[in-house]
């Protein structure tokens, strides 16, 4: 690996750490990046290293000020939804401005209909370009309900999550 590979992996690790701090499950991805960094640094594969120590200022950095890498596609605002049984985490990522927008919300566990109504309200207010819902487990039910609710709104969603507003 080159120095650029190391910088890319380190930046990716910082992004994953920020997402984990905001409530997203990304332990597997963090483990993968750490193992690649271990190989690059010549560390034994079984050694234990706290992933916060590998990034420069990850531990004290505010997610609203986090900068996304320069290779990110420009012009997109992504609404990322991580549904869980206890609460659902919603994060608006403004890729165009290369930062996370400060809209982190936690929706207490309710019916899928209630959560879908709140997500549609956020879509109307913030008008992101794409909606990404983790459809593993209970997320599939939430995604189906959001699609159903969007049919009565002036918002169309493609199978890939791209949103079109009328």
Swiss-Prot record:
Q: What is the superkingdom listed in this entry's lineage?
A: Bacteria
Would you tell me the protein name for this molecule?
SPbeta prophage-derived uncharacterized protein YonH
List the lineage, top down: Bacteria, Bacillati, Bacillota, Bacilli, Bacillales
């Amino acid at each position: 690996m080159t120095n650029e590979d190391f910088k890319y992996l380190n930046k990716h690790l910082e992004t994953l750490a920020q997402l984990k701090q905001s409530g997203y499950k990304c332990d597997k991805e963090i483990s993968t990046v750490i193992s690649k960094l271990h190989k690059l640094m010549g560390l034994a594969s079984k050694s234990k290293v706290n992933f916060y120590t590998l990034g420069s200022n990850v531990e004290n950095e505010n997610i609203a000020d986090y900068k996304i890498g320069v290779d990110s596609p420009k012009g997109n605002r992504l609404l990322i939804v991580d549904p869980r049984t206890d609460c659902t985490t919603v994060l608006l990522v403004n890729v165009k401005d290369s930062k996370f927008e400060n809209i982190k919300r936690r929706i207490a566990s309710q019916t899928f209909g209630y959560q879908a109504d709140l997500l549609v309200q956020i879509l109307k207010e913030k008008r992101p370009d794409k909606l990404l819902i983790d459809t593993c487990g209970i997320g599939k039910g939430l995604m189906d309900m959001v699609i159903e609710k969007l049919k009565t709104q002036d918002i169309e969603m493609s199978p890939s999550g791209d949103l079109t507003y009328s």
